[in-house]
Amino acid sequence: MKQENLEKIIAFRHVLHEHPEVSNHEEYTRKLIKEFILNHMKSYLVFDEKDWLYCMKPYQPEKKTIVLRADHDAIMNSLNTPFHGCGHDGHTAILLGVMLEEEKKESEYNIIYLFQPAEENGSGAAICKPLFDKYHVDKIFGLHNMPNLRKNVIYYRPETVMCASVGYRITLLGVQSHASEPEKGRNPVYALSAFAKAIEPLAKQTGFQPFTFKNYHFSSLAMITIIHMNVGSLNFGISPANGEICLTLRAAKENELSILERYVRSYFEGLKEKFEVSIKEFDRFDENYADPSLVEKTIMKLKSAGLEVEQLSEPIRASEDFGYYKRFAPSMFVFVGMGACPSLHHDSYVFDDEIIPTAVHMFQVVIR
């Protein structure tokens, strides 16, 4: 990578880092991205779609089309203020670095540079669907930085790369009574506690081996994490009527996430004689799946270009909304190791600029 371009990109990454914006609120971030492109590059068309943007050189319909995607939203830290604790400022800088390096070069492909919002809550990829309605996309690539993997090594997997997941907020409404007469009410605490105990085995599933849970068979990892639970309020005279439990359901395979969902919904449907039941869904993420044929061809290219690559032994348990794009084109998602450093979403996390040249080079190789 040209030193001049690297210096521009690092400086801009630091600007983004100082102006973090959470999912669905990244207006100023996109303004900065757009200004950087217009100020430093003349060969690209910039398509501002209000909630997202993409760039490309003039489209040539006779060519195949590749999409390179980067996210740009931030998260909240423990002080409840936005910060770039997942490195999306770095992902954006990497994509801009590829654009700088490729500006004067010809390609046999149409290359679309997609700047996606709102990855953290799972809504951003779907927001960008009009891009895939407008263009026939032949391949799409994405990446994520990864602390505590060897620095500047490209990590990959065919098939499942990251898990599918969804959040559920379940509320129960029974009947309130005096705390001295709990038998005259319907307190949801026991129903919620029984459910929490029932799913305890699913909270301990950490591996990707087949297993059976209550006559449901899973071929790989499936788990439920209780992230919040609440009943009543701090009032010693009341046996409460209201309670809620919030869950993250997660599975390596989308069809097996559906099995978890059926189990949870069936469990609470069975409580409707005693309680009013509400189930709301949040933050749905598709399985992040890498097309095996595309992976094989791409890894051969990366090795030939001198990049160090390593196959992950198993998928990452976390989710990434890049998985949505497999609906439209063969996709591949990789990780760039950052070496020993604080983990993603940790308050002390900072993106490491030293992986930018490797990541830019990797993207340049895949579009050749």
Predicted regions and their residues:
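Acidic/His- and Gly-rich active-site-bordering loop/insert found
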Residues: 1-85, 89-109
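Divalent metal-coordination and catalytic microenvironments
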Residues: 16, 68, 88, 113, ...
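Non-cysteine beta-strand/loop elements that form the S-adenosyl-L-methionine
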Residues: 67-69, 144, 168-171, 333-338
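A short beta-alpha structural unit
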Residues: 225-232, 248, 277-299, 313-323, ...
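Zn-dependent metallopeptidase/amidohydrolase metal-coordination segment
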Residues: 310-367
